[in-house]
Amino acid sequence: MRVPCLIKWPGHIPAGQDRNGIQSHEDLFVTLAAAAGLPDLKQDLLKGYSMNGTTYKVHLDGYNNLDYWTGASMRSARREIFYYDETDLMAVRVDGWKLDIGVKHHGDWFDEKAYPSVPYITNLLMDPMERVTPDAPGFEYEGRKFFASKLWAPTGAGPFLAAHLKSLEDYPPRQGADTLSMKRAIDQAMRKLENAHGSSN
């Protein structure tokens, strides 16, 4: 989930700068719009904004990070990232902490999703490869002790999760994500077969 991004804008973005704050590809549109002269586009679209004869009232998930890019601010405007697997919220990151709400125990895309009773807690600054989890070999007393000492961490994500869920309520997604779940596809096919009076078309 971490990829490099190189930006060059002579006279505006200082050369040779490293920025390691949280950013997302979702931020690019809002930030580039600000650079093009529309710094309030995200807020305008929330209220309804007309472009080329069409009024759009939508929620953009991105943050305007132009001040961060230009050095006017040393902190990213974004503090949180939400991780989805198709339509399922699997994790949330706030600052250096990541909470895995849903997991795939073997780390493979093919794995069944599982939802532990307590989120897996990772400090990404200490463990950027996310190797210290309850599924990891050798996660014994010290791992459990660290995990237990950080059970306060999920409370920090609460306000971010609440705001995210409110945005989905106020601005429902226009199109849901499809799924590649074979179980779901088979269940749907079986329901159609069980409907003896249903159409065969």
Regions found by a protein language model. Give the residues of each.
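Catalytic cores of eukaryotic secretory-pathway lumenal/extracellular enzymes that build
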Residues: 1-6, 118
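Generic detection of intrinsically disordered/low-complexity segments and helix-coil linkers/edges
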Residues: 3, 76-78, 146
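Short glycine/proline-rich turn/loop motifs
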Residues: 4, 8-13, 131, 141-142
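A structural signal for alpha-helix termini and helix-coil/disorder junctions
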Residues: 9, 38, 71, 163, ...
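C-terminal cap/loop subdomain of S1 sulfatases and analogous C-terminal strand-loop tails that border
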Residues: 13-17, 21, 26-131
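Long, internal low-complexity/basic segments
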Residues: 99, 105, 111-120, 124-201
